[in-house]
Structure formats: structure tokens, C-alpha cells
Amino acid sequence: KTDLQKMIGRVAICCDAAHAFGASRKGKMVGAIADFSSFSFHAVKNFTTAEGGALTWNLPFGKEKVVKNLDKCDENAFSGVPEIEGETWNENLYRKAQLLSLHGQNKDALAKTKLGAWEYDIIGTWYKCNMTDVVAAIGLVQMQRYKGMLERRRKMIARYDEALKPLNVVVLNHYDEEHISSGHLYLVRLLGKTREETNKVIEKMAERGIATNVHYKPLPMMTAYKKLGFDIKDFPNAFHMFENEITLPLNTKMTDEDLEYVIENFVEIVSEL
């Protein structure tokens, strides 16, 4: 075990929070629940930088100084990273995340432009997955209006919920006393319907200029995973969730008129099934 694993004292809990930026549970923001959380800022997400994401951590000892070097473990991929005296665990993790994301370079582009500071080292043969400054700037601007975007999504979801009550459908619960969703997707399941019947709804909606989606097709149904020997018959719950799911449009560019148009047509088409 590394010193970090020993400090945590158990299996580290990592949260895939790709869709959850802005969500909370029992009063805690999603990034404050697990030890590590990863967020996606892809172009289709609520909060976007066009491409990219973020890794956050929430460690009770994060502000404590690292007493021993994390990298003394020979099996640790970071065994070549030098120790910095007086560094906290948060600072240590941030530094290592930077190294992982930019080919293991120990200086960023700005640091190399300082007078006489051209030289740098490659500490490890790692990855190229850093967010550019340009797209980060998009995120900083969007952050200023994100609260309003979440509120708009909540109102749209409330309207969908009310309008679809008469239908034989189940929708994802976005809000209750214990949790607040980011309102990323509006998922609807057409009870008692097959995938083929649900696809007909998608086609008819498309004929009326309304783009819907499916979230998600199970991996065992994908060609690459079939080649690996996966069979959807072994995953009945995944197929059950997929077989009659349809995702309705939900974005802050939609006007109230757009929303009503989607509702009117969806209710009509589903009622005729």
C-alpha cells in the first residue's frame, strides 16, 4: 500500500459524477461525498467547457503535511516523483494529477517562459489529458450563470412531470427531500412497451422535428463487447432498464413554447401506442 492508501485506511471510494455537477444529497454537494469524484464537462453536459472535465477529492487529512514520501513504494507508478518538503496531501495530489495529465512534465508552459527557466524534466511516461486554458475560460464564465441554468432545468422538469402524469410511464425522480439532481437528462420509461415500440415513438417524434435519445444501450449489446464474450442475456436488469427507455429534450436553450411542443407531441404519440 502507498502512504495515501494507509492514510485513508480502507478501500478508496471513487464517484463517477459525470452528469452530477451541481447535484447534492442530504445537504452535501456531490463532490463532497466520495473520496474522489470525476466530472465531465463534455459539450452535451449541463456545465460544459466543450471538452474536458475535473477530478476532485475530499480527504479529511488533506490539509495535513505529508510526513513520508508517497513514492517510497517501489510498485507505485509515482516512485520517480521527488518529495517536496512541507507539502500537504492536497498539494501532493494536485501536483501528481498535473504530472499525470501532461506527459509527466515537471513544468507547465508558463513556468518555462520565465527568464532562464527553459529547462524541464519528464518524470514519468504518463498521459496527455490536460484541459486547455481556452476551454477552462469558457467554464469560468459559465460558472457565473450556472445557478440560473440549474433553476431553469428544474422548472422544465417540473413541467414535464406534471404533463406526463396521465400517461402509463415512469420518470426519473430528480428532486426530493434527500437529493437535488443536476437535471441533466429527462428519462422516461414506457411501461409494458418493447424496444421496438419505443423506437417507433422516437421515429414519430423525429418526423415532427423533435430529437429524442436513449440512455443507454447496455455495453453487452455493443459489437466490441460481444466479441469479448459478453451476452445481454446474462444482464437482464440492464436490458430491462433499456428496453423501453426514451430521453426527452432538456436544455436551457429551449423556450417554454419548445417545451410545450415536445409535451404535446409526446403525449399524443404515446397515447396512440
Positions of predicted regions on the chain:
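Conserved beta-strand->loop/alpha-helix structural units within folded catalytic cores of enzymes
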Residues: 47-48, 259
